[in-house]
From Swiss-Prot:
WD repeats lie at residues 13-57, 68-106, 188-227, 231-270, 275-315, 318-358. Coiled coil: none annotated. Keywords: Membrane, mRNA transport, Nuclear pore complex, Nucleus, Protein transport, Repeat, Translocation, Transport, WD repeat. InterPro entries: WD40/YVTN_repeat-like_dom_sf, WD40_repeat_dom_sf, WD40_rpt. The lineage of its organism: Eukaryota, Amoebozoa, Evosea, Eumycetozoa, Dictyostelia. Its main location: nucleus. One of its GO terms (cellular component) is nuclear pore outer ring. The gene is nup43. Transmembrane segments: none annotated. Component of the nuclear pore complex (NPC). One of its GO terms (biological process) is protein transport. Component of the nuclear pore complex, a complex required for the trafficking across the nuclear membrane. This is Nuclear pore complex protein nup43.
Amino acid sequence: MSSVSVHYSTHKINKVRFLNRNFHNDTSLFVTGTNHPVLSKNKISVWGLESRQNSDEIEELASVPIDGIVTELKVIEINNKPMIIGSTSKGSIFMYSIFNLPNKFEYIGYDGLLDKKYENYNNINNINDTYDTCNLLKERIWFNSSSNNNNVNSNNINNNNYNNNNNNYNNNNNNNNNNNNNNNNNNNNGSCINSFDISYDQHSLVTVGNDGVMNLLSIENLIPIYTNRYIDGLSVNVVKSITSNQIITSGELGRYIKFWDIRSNSSQPVKTIKTQCPRIFSLAIHKDEQHIIAAGSSDGQVNLFDIRNDYSIDQNKTHNSNVWELSFSKSNPNQLYSCSEDGFIYQYSYNKDNLGGGGMMTLPNQINNTFDIYSKEVSLLQLPTSIGSIDSFDINSNINRLICCSTSSQCLIVKSL
């Protein structure tokens, strides 16, 4: 029997993401971002989750203030270090590394020795910050000042792959602190970044925003390596990476899904699909069959498209309001999930014959990996009523847990699957 636990917060949490790694026990890490109307009161946090038979306990391990509403959030691993990457309504992309995880939340492969390098650096430079507890350390930040390409800049706060040369650390820190002050003075009001996505190889990330511009940034230093100013005449709502070179977007003009190839010499999309959706808020790409795209719209529709064609291959009118997020399951990519402003989360199973019922608990040898729209099963996930809009969700298949958040109820909900 599945369990549901509700955890109330003093903050309006609007983004939640798991770190998808194997942990030693029934634990996991997830991160959150907020959308407080007073922009200076927003923050990102890292949490620990302990999975139990009848309930789940969460614990906020560390947090840092963020200037602006958090519009998107990812957590990945770089050089054996968990890294939070996020975007804001004030036009910044930020990267924070997570240091000194409590022992019970250390995952397989986590290298805690990297933390000592920063402790040594602080001792040499007489910095009083302690790292006895879990902390978030700013690594890099980039400001979207795309109205003037010369103003697009990045601030690499800790680079050189954790250089052991302490003199280099000292020089780099002084230079970067000066750059940081200049950046903060000149770029606090960049164009809002509505969405970003990370390439499959984790070498780059792509951003879109209110300015209708697409930027491809190197994750190593957050320096733009490709810019296209002709994505849309208005704001772009969502972007997803198909491959390191292929990207899809949808914007305020609505109804259109555009496909881009940065290897092309043209600034125009290589393909455009006109949908029946009034406005698309969310996109998802099938992990194994990357020609299958899911789109969630403002009228509650969740439609599937095969980009080899110009029409939808499946339509679902399950929600009655904005579909904020979509995600294919990482463990069973033939399962799609959607969350909406109407307060519901749906699962769409496209497994051939739906062996094992299509649930998350299906054993690997019971899953038929064939994607089949004719074997679709749609189910509503049971959540507490009167929660309000479900703004974001994520699934950790290692512990069979779904986590979601609601800004209207200011809560996090953890559900076993």
